[in-house]
Amino acid sequence: MLTNTLMLVRTHPQDMAREDEFNEWYTGNHVPDVLHAPGLTAALRYKLAMTHIGEVPPYLALYYIDNDDATDANNGMMAYLNAPDPKRMVMPEATGQGDEWKIHGAGGGTRPGGLISVDTWAYYTKTLEVGENDVSPDNAAEGLLVTYTAPAADADVDALNKWYDWHMDDIISTPGIRGGARYKIASVNAGEATQFVGIFELETDDVEKVAGDLGATLATAPSGGIPTTESGASALDIFGFAYYKLESAPTKEHTLLP
């Protein structure tokens, strides 16, 4: 069973020529550091493989927090990150002039831009979990399908959510997809985030095959197509529909130290 609170972070290297350095710091020092924050149970990093809808940042980090109160979880995280730690390495400096970014809320403020450019730092609350999910380092999903969505302005939200819950059962009936969860936004620390995120775990990194099989599944799925509004438009706004491959499954053990 997945935790009810998810911290989702999307990033990209400020300088793609230094992508290896970006990943070395992120996987070797930063994620193991964050895993020592209160309530953290697991963290996984994924790299974008292909996008069917929208423009999606190339890196996704998922942090699972055993605290049902997302606000309290964030407060604990900020207090931890603002306290000194001898094993913590500062973010590598940008190439040239980095872009400053702002963290909202208490303990935040404007931060100097470094090699890691933050597109999204947000907390989500789980609304539904289906199938078999495992975020442990030894059995992390080899790939993900992630949907970034929101109800359309004039959608019947209750009806749409009921359909989406049914739709999730259809998705995980696809060969190669073992489980999934849907999350609703709780708060945004930095960047932009969609109201809902659907995360589906893949048993394979052959995302092209899974995408083809999913298309075949949904063509005859019992849940049918996306509901429409009274005007006939789609009741669901889709800002991103993307497949990822596992980049790393860090533990609390640092592999990169100052």
Locations of the language-model features?
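Macromolecular interaction modules
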Residues: 1-258
